[in-house]
C-alpha cells in the first residue's frame, strides 16, 4: 500500500489557511456572544418602568443605558437627515433632531426612518412647541457610512452620510449628552422606528462562524 503524501497545495492550505479559517470562525462566535449580551441587556432594561430625566441623570451609565425615559422640552430646528437608509426596499432618511429639555440639557433624538418621497423638508426647520416624549436611552455610536471626512452643509436640515458624537457635538457647538434617545413610535414627531441595539442579530454571526469552520473542514 502506498503511503499517503499530501501535495504542496494541501500543505500550503493546512499551514496557512486552516488556522486563518479557525480564527475567523472564532471571531464570529465572539461577535455573536457580544451581540447576544447587548440584546439581553436591552430587553431587560426595556422591561423596567419608564423613568424621567432627573432619575436618569442620577444613575451611572450601566444602570441608565437602554432604559425607557420620559423627557419634557422642545425639538430645535437642528435636524440631521442621515442618507442612504433603505427600509423595505425604499430609499429614505433616518432623522435626528436636537431636543432641549426643561432641565436645560440637549439630547440628539433619533426620530426614525422616513421615505424621501414623504418628508417635508421645510417643516423640519421649525422649532416645536413644548412637548413630552418617550424613548430608549441608547449609546451614541456611529450611524451611517464610515467616512474619513463628514461633509456637512451650512443650513438646516443637513443631509449627512455619517453621524457620530464628535461630528454632532462640534457642528452643534452644544454640551451634548453622549447618548441618543430612540424615539418611541407613539411620541409626537416620530417617524418609523428602525433602530436596533446591535446592527446584526447574534444568529447572523453564529451562521458566519459555521461557514468559516465548515470551510476549514472541507
Task: Describe each PLM feature range.
Residues 1-57, 64-218:
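Surface-exposed, charge/polar-rich loops and edge strands
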Amino acid at each position: 500500500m502506498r503511503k499517503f503524501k499530501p501535495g504542496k497545495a494541501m500543505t500550503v492550505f493546512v499551514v496557512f489557511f486552516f488556522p486563518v479559517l479557525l480564527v475567523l470562525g472564532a471571531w464570529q462566535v465572539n461577535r455573536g456572544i457580544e451581540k447576544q449580551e447587548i440584546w439581553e441587556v436591552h430587553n431587560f432594561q426595556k422591561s423596567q418602568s419608564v423613568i424621567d430625566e432627573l432619575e436618569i441623570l442620577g444613575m451611572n451609565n450601566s444602570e441608565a443605558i437602554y432604559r425607557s425615559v420620559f423627557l419634557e422640552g422642545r425639538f430645535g430646528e437642528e435636524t440631521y437627515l442621515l442618507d442612504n437608509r433603505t427600509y423595505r426596499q425604499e430609499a429614505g432618511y433616518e432623522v435626528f433632531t436636537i431636543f432641549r429639555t426643561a432641565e436645560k440639557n440637549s439630547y440628539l433624538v433619533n426620530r426614525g426612518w422616513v421615505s424621501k418621497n414623504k418628508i417635508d423638508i421645510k417643516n423640519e426647520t421649525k422649532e416645536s412647541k413644548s412637548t413630552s416624549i418617550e424613548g430608549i436611552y441608547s449609546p451614541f455610536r456611529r450611524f451611517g457610512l464610515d467616512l474619513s471626512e463628514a461633509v456637512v452643509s451650512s443650513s438646516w436640515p443637513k443631509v449627512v452620510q455619517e453621524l457620530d458624537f464628535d461630528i454632532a457635538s462640534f457642528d452643534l457647538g452644544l454640551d451634548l449628552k453622549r447618548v441618543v434617545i430612540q424615539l418611541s413610535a407613539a411620541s409626537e414627531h416620530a417617524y418609523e422606528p428602525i433602530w436596533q441595539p446591535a446592527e446584526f442579530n447574534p444568529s447572523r454571526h453564529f451562521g458566519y462562524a459555521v461557514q468559516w469552520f465548515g470551510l476549514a473542514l472541507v
